Amino acid sequence: DDDLIDHPVEMGRPKVISFVVAGIVHDMVFTGVLPNIDFERIAADTAKICEAQIRLFEPESNTPPFGDHGARYVFLTTVTGNDYGGLEHRNSTALICSRKSLPIIGQNEQSKEYREFLGLVSHEYFHSWNIKRIKPAVFAPYRLDRATPTSLLWIFEGFTSYYDDLMLLRSGLISEQQYFDLVAETISRVNNDSGRIKQSVAESSFDAWTKFYQQDENARNQIVSYYTKGSLVALCLDLFIRQKTEHEKSLDDVMRYLWTHFGKNFYLGSQLGLREADVPEVLHQATGISQDELLNFLERYVYGTKKLPLKALLEAEGLKLTTLTKKSNTPVSLDIRTANREGQCVIQSVMQHGAAHQGGLSAGDVLVAIDGLRVNASNLEELLSRYQSKQKALVHVFRRDELRSFTVEFNTPLYAEFQLQPKKDRLATMAPTNEVEDTSEQMPSQVESEQ
């Protein structure tokens, strides 16, 4: 039983604010230096996220999943100068964020950092269903003495990554265009690493222990994230289902099917996990789409590396996906990522087929000079702005303790930025397939705790 280890413990004098959603008390616990933070706003916004997610999985009963083990949920949040992340637990989550991620009293606008924090909250809360109760069969029970690989993380993390921002939209915390911008950012991230055409999301899932969490300097050219590409697979699958069923069904119905058949009674005795072989049948039963069509989708985009049909699927929803046109005076690029190490400009990774790769530069090289002008950690962009595409420069680097020179031909940046916007005649929406009234209830006052 993982009961004890799945409940994090924190001792100190935290700031606690509580609210009630669907009859369940939710505590937001903050530790760290917390100057002028608007805790009431954070709690109110978080309550909207929780209510929207409960409504997704239980549109009729509006029942949260925590009845199987204590009627309470806790957001343990450590606030620091510059951190970000989270880990899901059965009826809690351990979060870490920067102070600038949290709104201050009197600040009405929603900052990019606060929106990212709300996305993190949404992601970890969604895991209360999707991984903490709906589990891969190999996680039932957990093996604590060894790594347990599964090829299904594209569902458990990818689908969760898809819904984390979608829930911000459905809860009214971001606008439709803000949501489209977030989707476009994800599309840009996935499409600017060549690993997407070399590793499938199923392979990425299975190799998480050995590759995704042990990335080297060539990772961006060889692997793909089951989080980001998994979220795009979920988007495509959602649109595919909607269009095949004339918007009668969606990925929402798949999540409810998974919840009803695999998650709802997991801690009440069933201990039934999802097997890889179950996926086509689950999709078929939840949507009514033929298994042949579903298998074709899975083979191409989950187990294969075919280009996701984003443009066509979005087009059918009245959405236009475009690549932003680069201006002629766009600065050239070496197509590298660099790090500042004691003032030195060190190449962290080299994009395959980019200018640096073609010129012979390598990860680990320390950039010394470009055409005789010294490079440091802060002036690389300014030096590159002097050049045009197809021009060449002599680049000096230290490789280990050896001074080397390379002739590099610059090009326009390989990075492609995508934009997603609704067409003027758009009729379709990304609305949920079931709606109920908002039943969230804010507790009348915050509660401070010294325990």
Regions found by a protein language model. Name each.
Residues 55-69, 135-137, 170-176, 242-249, ...:
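Surface-exposed helix-capping loop/turn segments at secondary-structure junctions
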Residues 18-153:
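Juxtacatalytic substrate-recognition/specificity segment
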Residues 1-19, 48-51:
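Intrinsically disordered, low-complexity linkers and stems that provide flexible hinges
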Residues 164-165, 174-451:
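C-terminal recognition in membrane/secretory proteostasis and scaffolding
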